[in-house]
Protein backbone atom coordinates (compact mmCIF):
# COMPACT_ATOMS: atom_id res chain seq x y z
CA UNK A 1 0.00 0.00 0.00
CA UNK A 2 2.84 2.46 0.88
CA UNK A 3 4.76 1.71 -2.32
CA UNK A 4 1.66 2.12 -4.49
CA UNK A 5 0.85 5.39 -2.76
CA UNK A 6 4.35 6.76 -3.47
CA UNK A 7 4.09 5.73 -7.13
CA UNK A 8 0.67 7.42 -7.39
CA UNK A 9 2.00 10.65 -5.90
CA UNK A 10 4.98 10.59 -8.29
CA UNK A 11 2.69 10.04 -11.27
CA UNK A 12 0.44 12.86 -10.12
CA UNK A 13 3.39 15.19 -9.79
CA UNK A 14 4.67 14.35 -13.29
CA UNK A 15 1.21 14.72 -14.82
CA UNK A 16 0.58 18.06 -13.14
CA UNK A 17 3.96 19.47 -14.08
CA UNK A 18 3.57 18.45 -17.73
CA UNK A 19 -0.03 19.58 -18.13
CA UNK A 20 -0.22 22.88 -16.21
CA UNK A 21 0.78 25.95 -18.22
CA UNK A 22 0.66 28.09 -15.04
CA UNK A 23 3.18 26.25 -12.91
CA UNK A 24 6.13 28.31 -11.77
CA UNK A 25 9.14 28.22 -9.44
CA UNK A 26 10.68 31.24 -7.72
CA UNK A 27 14.37 31.99 -7.42
CA UNK A 28 16.19 30.08 -4.71
CA UNK A 29 16.04 32.33 -1.63
CA UNK A 30 16.25 35.48 -3.78
CA UNK A 31 19.49 34.47 -5.52
CA UNK A 32 19.27 35.47 -9.19
CA UNK A 33 20.32 33.43 -12.21
CA UNK A 34 19.28 30.12 -10.63
CA UNK A 35 16.97 28.07 -12.79
CA UNK A 36 13.92 26.25 -11.49
CA UNK A 37 12.87 22.62 -12.06
CA UNK A 38 12.96 21.69 -15.70
CA UNK A 39 10.64 19.18 -17.30
CA UNK A 40 11.85 17.56 -20.52
CA UNK A 41 12.13 14.20 -22.26
CA UNK A 42 15.65 13.96 -20.82
CA UNK A 43 14.43 14.19 -17.19
CA UNK A 44 15.04 11.51 -14.58
CA UNK A 45 12.83 8.47 -15.39
CA UNK A 46 11.56 8.23 -11.86
CA UNK A 47 10.59 11.87 -11.25
CA UNK A 48 10.64 13.46 -14.68
CA UNK A 49 12.87 16.20 -13.19
CA UNK A 50 16.24 17.46 -14.41
CA UNK A 51 18.45 19.59 -12.18
CA UNK A 52 21.23 21.85 -13.56
CA UNK A 53 24.58 21.98 -11.84
CA UNK A 54 23.23 24.39 -9.25
CA UNK A 55 21.59 24.04 -5.79
CA UNK A 56 18.20 22.28 -5.73
CA UNK A 57 15.24 24.51 -6.52
CA UNK A 58 11.51 24.30 -5.76
CA UNK A 59 8.86 22.97 -8.13
CA UNK A 60 5.16 23.75 -8.62
CA UNK A 61 2.36 22.38 -10.78
CA UNK A 62 -1.23 23.55 -11.08
CA UNK A 63 -3.18 26.75 -11.55
CA UNK A 64 -1.53 29.45 -9.44
CA UNK A 65 0.42 26.84 -7.48
CA UNK A 66 3.37 28.26 -5.54
CA UNK A 67 6.52 26.47 -4.27
CA UNK A 68 8.73 29.05 -2.56
CA UNK A 69 11.06 27.03 -0.35
CA UNK A 70 14.10 24.94 -1.24
CA UNK A 71 13.10 21.39 -2.22
CA UNK A 72 9.44 22.43 -1.80
CA UNK A 73 6.62 21.03 -3.93
CA UNK A 74 3.17 22.53 -4.60
CA UNK A 75 0.69 20.54 -6.69
CA UNK A 76 -2.89 21.65 -7.30
CA UNK A 77 -4.76 24.85 -7.95
CA UNK A 78 -3.57 27.60 -5.56
CA UNK A 79 -1.46 25.06 -3.65
CA UNK A 80 1.32 26.74 -1.64
CA UNK A 81 4.57 25.32 -0.23
CA UNK A 82 6.10 28.29 1.58
CA UNK A 83 9.20 26.91 3.33
CA UNK A 84 12.09 24.56 2.62
CA UNK A 85 11.23 20.90 1.95
CA UNK A 86 7.52 21.73 2.26
CA UNK A 87 4.96 19.74 0.26
CA UNK A 88 1.44 20.93 -0.59
CA UNK A 89 -0.70 18.57 -2.69
CA UNK A 90 -4.32 19.36 -3.48
CA UNK A 91 -6.36 22.35 -4.48
CA UNK A 92 -6.03 25.09 -1.91
CA UNK A 93 -3.55 23.12 0.18
CA UNK A 94 -1.02 25.09 2.26
CA UNK A 95 2.31 23.99 3.80
CA UNK A 96 3.82 26.97 5.64
CA UNK A 97 6.50 25.31 7.78
CA UNK A 98 9.88 23.73 7.10
CA UNK A 99 9.50 20.01 6.32
CA UNK A 100 5.72 20.39 6.49
CA UNK A 101 3.36 18.26 4.38
CA UNK A 102 -0.23 19.09 3.40
CA UNK A 103 -2.02 16.50 1.25
CA UNK A 104 -5.64 16.95 0.32
CA UNK A 105 -7.81 19.80 -0.89
CA UNK A 106 -7.87 22.72 1.54
CA UNK A 107 -5.46 20.89 3.84
CA UNK A 108 -3.12 23.06 5.96
CA UNK A 109 0.25 22.25 7.50
CA UNK A 110 0.79 25.46 9.48
CA UNK A 111 4.07 24.84 11.28
CA UNK A 112 7.46 23.21 10.97
CA UNK A 113 7.28 19.41 10.50
CA UNK A 114 3.47 19.52 10.47
CA UNK A 115 1.77 16.75 8.46
CA UNK A 116 -1.83 16.65 7.21
CA UNK A 117 -3.56 14.11 5.03
CA UNK A 118 -7.20 14.61 4.19
CA UNK A 119 -9.55 17.21 2.85
CA UNK A 120 -9.72 20.34 5.01
CA UNK A 121 -7.36 18.80 7.57
CA UNK A 122 -5.16 21.12 9.66
CA UNK A 123 -1.96 20.50 11.65
CA UNK A 124 0.09 22.92 13.72
CA UNK A 125 3.83 22.67 14.43
CA UNK A 126 5.06 19.06 14.75
CA UNK A 127 1.44 17.89 14.57
CA UNK A 128 -0.06 15.07 12.49
CA UNK A 129 -3.66 15.23 11.20
CA UNK A 130 -4.97 12.31 9.13
CA UNK A 131 -8.55 12.32 7.89
CA UNK A 132 -10.95 14.81 6.42
CA UNK A 133 -11.41 17.81 8.74
CA UNK A 134 -8.92 16.38 11.22
CA UNK A 135 -7.03 19.06 13.17
CA UNK A 136 -4.25 19.27 15.77
CA UNK A 137 -2.49 21.75 18.00
CA UNK A 138 1.31 21.79 18.34
CA UNK A 139 2.82 18.27 18.68
CA UNK A 140 -0.67 16.76 18.58
CA UNK A 141 -1.96 13.76 16.63
CA UNK A 142 -5.48 13.48 15.16
CA UNK A 143 -6.55 10.42 13.16
CA UNK A 144 -10.06 10.06 11.78
CA UNK A 145 -12.78 12.12 10.17
CA UNK A 146 -13.38 15.36 12.11
CA UNK A 147 -10.99 14.27 14.88
CA UNK A 148 -9.55 17.15 16.93
CA UNK A 149 -6.44 17.24 19.14
CA UNK A 150 -6.77 20.85 20.32
CA UNK A 151 -4.36 20.57 23.26
CA UNK A 152 -0.59 20.43 22.93
CA UNK A 153 0.93 16.94 23.06
CA UNK A 154 -2.53 15.34 22.81
CA UNK A 155 -3.84 12.45 20.67
CA UNK A 156 -7.33 12.02 19.16
CA UNK A 157 -8.01 8.77 17.28
CA UNK A 158 -11.41 7.97 15.83
CA UNK A 159 -14.33 9.61 14.07
CA UNK A 160 -15.16 12.95 15.77
CA UNK A 161 -12.86 12.18 18.71
CA UNK A 162 -11.88 15.33 20.61
CA UNK A 163 -9.24 16.47 23.12
CA UNK A 164 -10.15 19.93 24.47
CA UNK A 165 -7.58 22.73 24.43
CA UNK A 166 -7.17 22.75 28.24
CA UNK A 167 -6.65 18.96 28.47
CA UNK A 168 -2.93 18.77 27.73
CA UNK A 169 -1.19 15.39 27.44
CA UNK A 170 -4.56 13.61 27.11
CA UNK A 171 -5.71 10.90 24.66
CA UNK A 172 -9.17 10.26 23.18
CA UNK A 173 -9.62 6.89 21.45
CA UNK A 174 -12.74 5.76 19.62
CA UNK A 175 -15.71 7.15 17.78
CA UNK A 176 -16.89 10.43 19.44
CA UNK A 177 -14.63 9.92 22.44
CA UNK A 178 -13.92 13.07 24.48
CA UNK A 179 -11.55 13.93 27.32
CA UNK A 180 -12.63 15.74 30.49
CA UNK A 181 -9.29 16.51 32.20
CA UNK A 182 -5.52 16.77 31.74
CA UNK A 183 -3.22 13.73 31.54
CA UNK A 184 -6.13 11.34 30.92
CA UNK A 185 -7.12 8.63 28.45
CA UNK A 186 -10.77 8.53 27.30
CA UNK A 187 -12.48 5.79 25.28
CA UNK A 188 -15.95 7.36 25.34
CA UNK A 189 -17.80 10.35 26.75
CA UNK A 190 -20.31 11.20 29.49
CA UNK A 191 -23.16 9.24 27.85
CA UNK A 192 -21.08 6.64 25.99
CA UNK A 193 -19.00 4.19 28.00
CA UNK A 194 -16.79 1.41 26.64
CA UNK A 195 -14.96 -1.54 28.11
CA UNK A 196 -11.25 -2.31 27.96
CA UNK A 197 -11.12 -6.01 27.10
CA UNK A 198 -8.35 -8.62 27.24
CA UNK A 199 -6.52 -6.52 29.83
CA UNK A 200 -3.64 -8.27 31.59
CA UNK A 201 -3.35 -8.12 35.35
CA UNK A 202 -1.37 -5.13 36.58
CA UNK A 203 2.01 -5.73 38.22
CA UNK A 204 3.17 -2.22 39.17
CA UNK A 205 1.55 0.55 41.18
CA UNK A 206 0.74 2.54 38.03
CA UNK A 207 -0.71 -0.40 36.06
CA UNK A 208 -4.43 -0.85 35.41
CA UNK A 209 -6.32 -3.50 37.40
CA UNK A 210 -8.57 -6.04 35.66
CA UNK A 211 -11.81 -7.45 37.06
CA UNK A 212 -10.18 -10.69 38.20
CA UNK A 213 -7.65 -8.78 40.29
CA UNK A 214 -10.37 -6.55 41.70
CA UNK A 215 -12.54 -9.52 42.70
CA UNK A 216 -9.58 -11.15 44.40
CA UNK A 217 -8.80 -7.99 46.36
CA UNK A 218 -12.48 -7.57 47.29
CA UNK A 219 -12.61 -11.14 48.58
CA UNK A 220 -9.41 -10.58 50.54
CA UNK A 221 -10.74 -7.31 51.96
CA UNK A 222 -14.06 -8.96 52.85
CA UNK A 223 -12.24 -11.80 54.58
CA UNK A 224 -10.12 -9.35 56.57
CA UNK A 225 -13.21 -7.28 57.36
CA UNK A 226 -15.13 -10.32 58.59
CA UNK A 227 -12.18 -11.41 60.70
CA UNK A 228 -11.75 -7.95 62.15
CA UNK A 229 -15.50 -7.62 62.75
CA UNK A 230 -15.53 -10.92 64.62
CA UNK A 231 -12.60 -9.78 66.77
CA UNK A 232 -14.25 -6.43 67.46
CA UNK A 233 -17.55 -8.13 68.30
CA UNK A 234 -15.84 -10.54 70.68
CA UNK A 235 -13.97 -7.68 72.34
CA UNK A 236 -17.15 -5.62 72.55
CA UNK A 237 -19.09 -8.52 74.08
CA UNK A 238 -16.33 -9.20 76.59
CA UNK A 239 -16.13 -5.52 77.45
CA UNK A 240 -19.92 -5.26 77.74
CA UNK A 241 -20.12 -8.39 79.92
CA UNK A 242 -17.35 -7.09 82.16
CA UNK A 243 -18.94 -3.68 82.44
CA UNK A 244 -22.38 -5.20 83.01
CA UNK A 245 -21.05 -7.39 85.82
CA UNK A 246 -19.20 -4.46 87.34
CA UNK A 247 -22.18 -2.12 87.11
CA UNK A 248 -24.55 -4.82 88.39
CA UNK A 249 -22.26 -5.49 91.35
CA UNK A 250 -22.08 -1.80 92.17
CA UNK A 251 -25.86 -1.47 91.85
CA UNK A 252 -26.48 -4.52 94.03
CA UNK A 253 -24.07 -3.30 96.69
CA UNK A 254 -25.66 0.13 96.60
CA UNK A 255 -29.13 -1.38 96.83
CA UNK A 256 -28.19 -3.68 99.70
CA UNK A 257 -26.52 -0.84 101.55
CA UNK A 258 -29.43 1.56 101.05
CA UNK A 259 -32.02 -1.13 101.88
CA UNK A 260 -30.25 -2.04 105.11
CA UNK A 261 -29.88 1.62 105.98
CA UNK A 262 -33.55 2.29 105.21
CA UNK A 263 -34.74 -0.68 107.26
CA UNK A 264 -32.55 0.28 110.19
CA UNK A 265 -33.79 3.88 110.07
CA UNK A 266 -37.40 2.68 109.87
CA UNK A 267 -36.87 0.31 112.80
CA UNK A 268 -35.27 3.04 114.89
CA UNK A 269 -38.01 5.50 113.98
CA UNK A 270 -40.79 3.01 114.75
CA UNK A 271 -39.13 2.02 118.03
CA UNK A 272 -38.70 5.64 119.04
CA UNK A 273 -42.29 6.50 118.18
CA UNK A 274 -43.61 3.38 119.95
CA UNK A 275 -41.50 4.19 122.99
CA UNK A 276 -42.86 7.74 123.01
CA UNK A 277 -46.43 6.46 122.70
CA UNK A 278 -45.93 3.95 125.48
CA UNK A 279 -44.39 6.57 127.73
CA UNK A 280 -47.29 8.92 127.02
CA UNK A 281 -49.83 6.17 127.62
CA UNK A 282 -48.09 5.13 130.84
CA UNK A 283 -47.97 8.69 132.09
CA UNK A 284 -51.64 9.25 131.21
CA UNK A 285 -52.68 5.99 132.81
CA UNK A 286 -50.78 6.79 135.98
CA UNK A 287 -52.35 10.22 136.09
CA UNK A 288 -55.86 8.84 135.63
CA UNK A 289 -55.25 6.14 138.23
CA UNK A 290 -53.96 8.63 140.75
CA UNK A 291 -56.92 10.92 140.15
CA UNK A 292 -59.38 8.03 140.41
CA UNK A 293 -57.73 6.72 143.56
CA UNK A 294 -57.73 10.13 145.17
CA UNK A 295 -61.39 10.61 144.25
CA UNK A 296 -62.27 7.19 145.57
CA UNK A 297 -60.38 7.80 148.79
CA UNK A 298 -62.05 11.14 149.30
CA UNK A 299 -65.45 9.68 148.55
CA UNK A 300 -64.86 6.68 150.78
CA UNK A 301 -63.64 8.85 153.61
CA UNK A 302 -66.65 11.10 153.23
CA UNK A 303 -69.04 8.17 153.25
CA UNK A 304 -67.25 6.61 156.14
CA UNK A 305 -67.35 9.76 158.12
CA UNK A 306 -71.06 10.20 157.35
CA UNK A 307 -71.81 6.60 158.19
CA UNK A 308 -69.78 6.81 161.35
CA UNK A 309 -71.59 9.90 162.46
CA UNK A 310 -74.96 8.33 161.61
CA UNK A 311 -74.07 5.15 163.42
CA UNK A 312 -72.99 7.07 166.43
CA UNK A 313 -76.22 9.01 166.35
CA UNK A 314 -78.66 6.11 165.73
CA UNK A 315 -77.12 3.61 168.00
CA UNK A 316 -74.34 1.26 168.29
CA UNK A 317 -76.59 -1.48 166.87
CA UNK A 318 -76.68 0.17 163.50
CA UNK A 319 -72.98 0.95 163.50
CA UNK A 320 -71.87 -2.45 162.32
CA UNK A 321 -74.55 -2.60 159.59
CA UNK A 322 -73.81 0.89 158.41
CA UNK A 323 -70.14 0.21 158.39
CA UNK A 324 -70.65 -2.97 156.36
CA UNK A 325 -72.85 -1.14 153.85
CA UNK A 326 -70.28 1.58 153.59
CA UNK A 327 -67.50 -0.90 152.93
CA UNK A 328 -69.51 -2.72 150.24
CA UNK A 329 -70.35 0.54 148.57
CA UNK A 330 -66.75 1.67 148.70
CA UNK A 331 -65.48 -1.61 147.26
CA UNK A 332 -68.03 -1.46 144.44
CA UNK A 333 -67.13 2.08 143.53
CA UNK A 334 -63.42 1.37 143.65
CA UNK A 335 -63.76 -1.70 141.43
CA UNK A 336 -65.86 0.18 138.87
CA UNK A 337 -63.49 3.09 138.86
CA UNK A 338 -60.48 0.81 138.36
CA UNK A 339 -62.14 -1.02 135.46
CA UNK A 340 -63.05 2.26 133.77
CA UNK A 341 -59.48 3.54 134.10
CA UNK A 342 -57.98 0.33 132.75
CA UNK A 343 -60.38 0.29 129.75
CA UNK A 344 -59.61 3.90 128.92
CA UNK A 345 -55.88 3.23 129.13
CA UNK A 346 -56.09 0.16 126.87
CA UNK A 347 -58.09 2.02 124.19
CA UNK A 348 -55.74 5.00 124.26
CA UNK A 349 -52.61 2.86 124.06
CA UNK A 350 -54.09 0.72 121.24
CA UNK A 351 -55.02 3.76 119.13
CA UNK A 352 -51.63 5.38 119.66
CA UNK A 353 -49.79 2.17 118.79
CA UNK A 354 -51.81 1.65 115.60
CA UNK A 355 -51.19 5.23 114.52
CA UNK A 356 -47.47 4.88 115.20
CA UNK A 357 -47.26 1.64 113.25
CA UNK A 358 -49.27 3.10 110.34
CA UNK A 359 -47.07 6.20 110.16
CA UNK A 360 -43.97 4.02 110.38
CA UNK A 361 -45.21 1.82 107.52
CA UNK A 362 -46.06 4.87 105.40
CA UNK A 363 -42.61 6.32 106.01
CA UNK A 364 -40.96 3.01 105.14
CA UNK A 365 -43.04 2.66 101.93
CA UNK A 366 -42.12 6.21 100.90
CA UNK A 367 -38.43 5.52 101.40
CA UNK A 368 -38.64 2.28 99.40
CA UNK A 369 -40.44 4.10 96.55
CA UNK A 370 -37.65 6.68 96.50
CA UNK A 371 -35.13 3.85 96.44
CA UNK A 372 -37.00 2.18 93.54
CA UNK A 373 -36.99 5.45 91.58
CA UNK A 374 -33.26 5.83 92.10
CA UNK A 375 -32.68 2.25 91.02
CA UNK A 376 -34.82 2.79 87.91
CA UNK A 377 -32.78 5.87 87.02
CA UNK A 378 -29.60 3.92 87.67
CA UNK A 379 -30.82 1.11 85.40
CA UNK A 380 -31.60 3.62 82.65
CA UNK A 381 -28.14 5.19 82.93
CA UNK A 382 -26.50 1.77 82.91
CA UNK A 383 -28.49 0.75 79.80
CA UNK A 384 -27.61 3.99 78.01
CA UNK A 385 -23.96 3.61 79.02
CA UNK A 386 -23.82 0.07 77.63
CA UNK A 387 -25.62 1.16 74.44
CA UNK A 388 -23.13 4.03 73.98
CA UNK A 389 -20.24 1.65 74.60
CA UNK A 390 -21.58 -0.76 71.98
CA UNK A 391 -21.98 2.10 69.47
CA UNK A 392 -18.42 3.34 70.07
CA UNK A 393 -17.04 -0.16 69.69
CA UNK A 394 -18.71 -0.44 66.26
CA UNK A 395 -16.57 2.40 64.82
CA UNK A 396 -13.96 1.29 62.29
CA UNK A 397 -10.22 2.05 62.23
CA UNK A 398 -8.75 3.17 58.86
CA UNK A 399 -6.65 0.43 57.28
CA UNK A 400 -4.82 2.31 54.52
CA UNK A 401 -1.67 4.27 55.37
CA UNK A 402 -2.25 8.01 55.13
CA UNK A 403 -6.01 7.47 55.03
CA UNK A 404 -8.52 9.40 57.14
CA UNK A 405 -11.91 7.80 57.70
CA UNK A 406 -15.22 9.02 58.99
CA UNK A 407 -17.42 6.30 60.46
CA UNK A 408 -20.74 6.01 62.25
CA UNK A 409 -22.31 3.21 64.24
CA UNK A 410 -25.29 2.39 66.41
CA UNK A 411 -25.55 0.32 69.55
CA UNK A 412 -28.25 -0.85 71.90
CA UNK A 413 -28.75 -2.56 75.21
CA UNK A 414 -32.21 -3.70 76.29
CA UNK A 415 -34.53 -0.72 75.59
CA UNK A 416 -31.78 1.91 75.16
CA UNK A 417 -30.11 2.91 71.90
CA UNK A 418 -27.14 5.13 71.06
CA UNK A 419 -25.56 6.70 67.97
CA UNK A 420 -21.79 7.05 67.64
CA UNK A 421 -19.66 8.94 65.13
CA UNK A 422 -15.91 9.04 64.90
CA UNK A 423 -12.84 9.52 62.77
CA UNK A 424 -9.47 7.85 62.48
CA UNK A 425 -6.14 8.34 60.78
CA UNK A 426 -3.48 5.75 60.01
CA UNK A 427 -0.09 7.48 60.20
CA UNK A 428 1.82 4.48 58.88
CA UNK A 429 1.60 0.70 58.96
CA UNK A 430 2.38 0.62 62.70
CA UNK A 431 0.69 3.72 64.12
CA UNK A 432 -2.98 4.77 64.02
CA UNK A 433 -5.26 7.24 65.83
CA UNK A 434 -9.00 7.10 66.44
CA UNK A 435 -11.61 9.14 68.35
CA UNK A 436 -15.37 8.93 68.69
CA UNK A 437 -18.40 10.27 70.56
CA UNK A 438 -21.71 8.57 71.33
CA UNK A 439 -25.09 10.12 72.12
CA UNK A 440 -27.86 8.21 73.92
CA UNK A 441 -30.45 10.95 74.39
CA UNK A 442 -30.96 13.88 76.81
CA UNK A 443 -27.51 14.86 78.08
CA UNK A 444 -26.07 11.34 78.04
CA UNK A 445 -22.86 11.57 75.99
CA UNK A 446 -19.92 9.15 76.00
CA UNK A 447 -16.64 9.63 74.15
CA UNK A 448 -13.33 7.90 73.64
CA UNK A 449 -9.98 8.38 71.96
CA UNK A 450 -7.28 5.84 71.26
CA UNK A 451 -3.71 5.59 70.01
CA UNK A 452 -2.62 2.29 68.44
CA UNK A 453 0.92 0.97 67.90
CA UNK A 454 1.51 -2.34 66.13
CA UNK A 455 4.72 -4.30 65.51
Curated annotation (Swiss-Prot):
This is Adhesin YadA. Changing residue 156 to D: Loss of collagen-binding activity. Homotrimer; in gels migrates as monomers, dimers and homotrimers. Does not form trimers with distantly related EibA from E.coli; coexpression was lethal and one of the genes is eliminated in vivo. If the full translocator domain (368-455) is exchanged with that of EibA ('299-392'), will form heterotrimers with EibA and vice-versa. Induction: Induced at 37 degrees Celsius by the temperature-dependent transcriptional activator LcrF (VirF). The keyword Transport applies. GO terms for biological process: cell adhesion; protein secretion by the type V secretion system. Residues 26-363 are annotated as: Surface exposed passenger domain. Keywords: Cell adhesion, Cell outer membrane, Coiled coil, Membrane, Plasmid, Protein transport, Signal, Transmembrane, Transmembrane beta strand, Transport, Virulence. Gene3D superfamilies: GSPII I/J protein-like, Serralysin-like metalloprotease, C-terminal. Collagen-binding outer membrane protein forming a fibrillar matrix on the bacterial cell surface. Promotes initial attachment and invasion of eukaryotic cells. Also protects the bacteria by being responsible for agglutination, serum resistance, complement inactivation and phagocytosis resistance. Its main location: other. The signal peptide, cleaved at the inner membrane, guides the autotransporter protein to the periplasmic space. Then, trimerization and insertion of the C-terminal translocator domain in the outer membrane forms a hydrophilic pore for the translocation of the passenger domain to the bacterial cell surface. Presents a lollipop-shaped form which consists of three domains: a C-terminal membrane-anchor domain, a coiled-coil stalk domain and an oval N-terminal head domain. The N-terminal half of the sequence reveals the presence of repeated motifs with the consensus sequence NSVAIGXXS. Residues 209-243 form a coiled coil. Residues 403-455 are annotated as: Translocator domain. The chain crosses the membrane at residues 402-412, 416-427, 434-440, 444-455. It is found in: Cell surface; Cell outer membrane. Residues 1-25 form the signal peptide. One of its GO terms (cellular component) is cell surface.
